[in-house]
């Protein structure tokens, strides 16, 4: 009898130990979740979904905590929720649900929220998946307020994402001479003047100087820094038996208006716009641009010793060939091997080495 009682006690004791061990295991499991910050109710959902093992080894995710108890939870996105940084913003859970359904991953979504204003995220969720979106957002010259234009231009053209951002920043998603903007500072040496940016009709540079007659076909003026640079360039060209002259430099607003209107009378607006600027949109009014002539006092032509020398050397003096043969779709002007613009040595060298237009440079640096 005593032996039976003893055996019974051993069985009971063993059973109690097993219960304690099981309780300890359950407690540790619960403890692990608690150390990650999840609520007990959330952990219960983890158990029901059989995803505890996925959660235990991961850092606490407030996004997962919030979404798992909402109507926007989808179990197939567990791994994505774990890596999405939570934002205390209206419609956050709905927006990430929509972004995930479109095809964006957690890294994409984090970038989207880091780079965009909340209102603009609706533009993303209202469109199909854009594979280059995060690449666009990470460009230093991406502009939040241009997002809708970027998306439209990207979807309607076959350009890479760098060109899309660049061209929209230039304004090329609009027709030339539409959506025009006044130049912020007319006197800025680096002011961009093109078919989207115009100078005031009253602007006249206050530092115009006359270019030495040794380097000019007639009386021509440039701003002092550009005039000095041109004279240095023309003098150094002489050392290589190359003679170049300033043929048409500063023009006033009224001068340009007169010239352009005459061209329109001859060829019509559409054709005139390909080779002549409308008043206010001419670089000549800046006092930083000049048309260059050869010894016959005619504008230099392509593939001549003068044009070849300038192409290779003008940047050393701060000048760039403004309208090249391959850039008409960007500048809106036909090839002008004679038209050079002063922008300073550093920028001119960068443009020369990278084979880009000044429009592209400004679009990526302002």
Short names for language-model regions:
Residues 2-11, 23-248, 253-366:
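Extracytoplasmic cell-surface/polysaccharide-interacting catalytic and binding patches
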Residues 15-22:
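Core hydrophobic alpha-helical transmembrane segments of single-pass membrane proteins
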């Amino acid at each position: 009898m005593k032996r039976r009682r003893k055996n019974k006690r051993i069985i009971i004791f063993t059973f109690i130990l097993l219960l304690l061990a099981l309780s300890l295991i359950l407690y540790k499991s619960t403890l692990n979740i608690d150390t990650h910050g999840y609520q007990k109710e959330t952990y219960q959902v983890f158990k029901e979904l059989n995803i505890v093992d996925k959660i235990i080894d991961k850092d606490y995710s407030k996004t997962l905590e919030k979404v798992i108890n909402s109507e926007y939870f989808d179990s197939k996105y567990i791994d994505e929720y774990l890596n999405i940084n939570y934002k205390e913003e209206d419609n956050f859970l709905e927006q990430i649900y929509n972004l995930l359904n479109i095809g964006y991953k957690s890294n994409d979504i984090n970038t989207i929220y880091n780079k965009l204003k909340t209102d603009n995220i609706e533009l993303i969720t209202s469109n199909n998946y854009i594979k280059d979106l995060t690449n666009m957002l990470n460009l230093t010259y991406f502009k939040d307020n241009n997002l809708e234009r970027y998306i439209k231009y990207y979807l309607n053209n076959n350009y890479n994402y760098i060109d899309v951002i660049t061209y929209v920043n230039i304004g090329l998603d609009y027709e030339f001479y539409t959506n025009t903007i006044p130049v912020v500072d007319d006197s800025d040496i680096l002011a961009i003047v093109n078919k989207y940016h115009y100078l005031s009709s009253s602007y006249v540079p206050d530092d115009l100087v006359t270019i030495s007659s040794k380097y000019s076909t007639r009386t021509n003026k440039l701003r002092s820094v550009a005039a000095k640079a041109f004279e240095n360039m023309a003098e150094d060209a002489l050392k290589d038996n190359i003679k170049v002259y300033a043929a048409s430099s500063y023009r006033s607003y009224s001068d340009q208006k007169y010239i352009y209107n005459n061209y329109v009378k001859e060829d019509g607006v559409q054709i005139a716009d390909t080779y002549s600027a409308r008043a206010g949109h001419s670089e000549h009014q800046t006092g930083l641009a000049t048309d260059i002539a050869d010894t016959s006092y005619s504008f230099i032509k392509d593939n001549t010793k003068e044009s070849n020398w300038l192409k290779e050397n003008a940047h050393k003096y701060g000048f760039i060939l403004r309208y090249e043969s391959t850039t008409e779709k960007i500048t809106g002007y036909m090839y002008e091997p004679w038209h050079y613009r002063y922008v300073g040595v550093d920028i001119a060298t960068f443009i020369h080495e990278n084979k880009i237009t000044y429009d592209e440079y400004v679009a990526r640096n302002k």
